[in-house]
Design a protein with these regions (language model features):
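Alpha-helical transmembrane segments of polytopic membrane proteins
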Residues: 1-4, 11-12, 33-51, 102-114, ...
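Membrane-interface helix-loop-helix junctions at boundaries between adjacent transmembrane segments
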Residues: 1-43, 58-69
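Transmembrane alpha-helical segments of multi-pass membrane proteins
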Residues: 1-10, 69-85, 134-145
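Juxtamembrane "helix-exit" motif on the non-cytosolic side of transmembrane helices
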Residues: 13-28, 86-98, 150-161
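Canonical alpha-helical transmembrane segments
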Residues: 51-61, 114-123
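Short helix-loop boundary/capping segments
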Residues: 75-81, 85-90, 100-120
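C-terminal transmembrane-bundle signature of multipass membrane proteins
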Residues: 103-194
Length: 194
């Protein structure tokens, strides 16, 4: 969670010059990428990454084992909001074509990240709620789609200089969130009983 949060904060900070340019020259931005979208690309990954950094750090300190409420739902709402934004943003570029399969896979990984983020927030904000099966299913799906599809595709496109820094950091963040899903699915299984 901490590494995914750091990558998402980097993605948001890298969008800073674009948001600044959008404020200075709004006439340069068309209806395809409005000014408010530049600000959403700046603020949402920073807030989502900050939440993942903060609660990932708290989980390392042992707060995850205690049965207490871990945070405010208002700040936690930025996590699924960011992944919903990524899902919508990626879905608009996916035409019905086999040649655009990488774009379609990115849509699926954003949907898996959104589902896992919602389940993760449910675990953090409502302690003691029996949701092991849901956490296992969402964590496994996030691992398969985010780490199994998004991360190799991001690394391939980065190796061929096809990505900008914000897209690279967002892809790495979503891929690392899938590793967090694997860890959560592993922990949701519990200890082996004989």
């Amino acid at each position: 969670m901490v590494l995914a949060g750091a990558a998402l904060v980097t993605s948001g900070v890298a969008m800073g010059p674009v948001a600044k340019y959008a404020v200075q020259y709004p006439e340069m931005f068309s209806t395809d990428y409005p000014t408010w979208a530049a600000w959403a690309d700046l603020l949402l990954p920073v807030l989502c990454g900050a939440w993942l950094l903060y609660y990932g750090g708290r989980a390392f300190k042992g707060f995850g084992m205690q049965r207490q409420k871990l945070g405010s739902p208002l700040f936690a709402g930025t996590v699924p909001l960011y992944f919903l934004w990524k899902l919508i943003w990626r879905f608009q570029f996916t035409p019905a074509s086999v040649y655009r399969m990488p774009c379609a896979l990115r849509v699926l990984s954003a949907a898996a990240a959104l589902l896992f983020a919602v389940v993760l927030i449910k675990v953090f904000l409502v302690p003691g709620l029996p949701c092991g099966h849901t956490l296992y299913a969402a964590g496994t799906g996030a691992y398969l789609l985010c780490t199994g599809l998004e991360l190799p595709q991001t690394l391939f496109e980065a190796a061929h200089n096809m990505l900008t820094l914000p897209d690279l950091a967002a892809g790495l963040g979503i891929g690392l969130l899938g590793l967090c899903g694997l860890f959560c699915a592993w922990e949701a299984c519990g200890e082996e009983m004989e």
